[in-house]
């Protein structure tokens, strides 16, 4: 594709300022050597590094937020300090007259605009990273003797698997059963990680069907009847829900992050109040008992992806931002 890659060592969960400053210096050296027409920075640390570099040289820069991340989720003293410092740096970056801030949904746009004081005309929403509906083809869900619900994510508590298991326990007491397929990436060094021992315990108890890391989530979605992501993590637009909607599966999610920018309640899925396993169980029961409703929601989800979330739309909007930013 013609990409030339330059390696800069960054540790995702590290708060070591020495390591971060070293990465900043290395990245700035590379940026100076390349002298790019435009910088496009994605996720927190690259945005801070690239944004500061661009501000210092008054260069065109695009800052992309793919959700706000845990720094805007937790209220521990260290996180509040980091959040305050991050906001200060973003205020500095926002002083670049040739900078644009992209968000995946309007909640993040409004929050960062308020905290940082960004001019509204310098912000834009592009709905997610986009998905190709021709690759994630629509299919009618298969009938199973016991319905299949899919959860696929990093194995973090904040992604909602714990609440989903509580909902399953509630429904099991009412003699309502489903297979909970769980696929995901272990995050062993993360403080929010679900221990592998507990995952195996849930599997052995029949609460989940642990599939481990999957290289073909598309196939898992096709085999499922419902896709669930009760996440409280400050998401962008979750890839899992995009893929599930494109394939035509009814989705159930919490009212956080970008989940409810894709899922419209009672149209292409169900939105549940965050941190409510009881309500999650009620809404999940509704989907399990109403296959025709699921089919209608699946068709609506496919339509919504094609109209607003397709990769070609995202690409065209992004390229236009490049042209406008370089030309300003």
Which stretches of residues belong to each language-model region?
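Nucleotide-activated donor-binding/catalytic signature segment of Leloir-type glycosyltransferases, i.e.
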Residues: 193-214
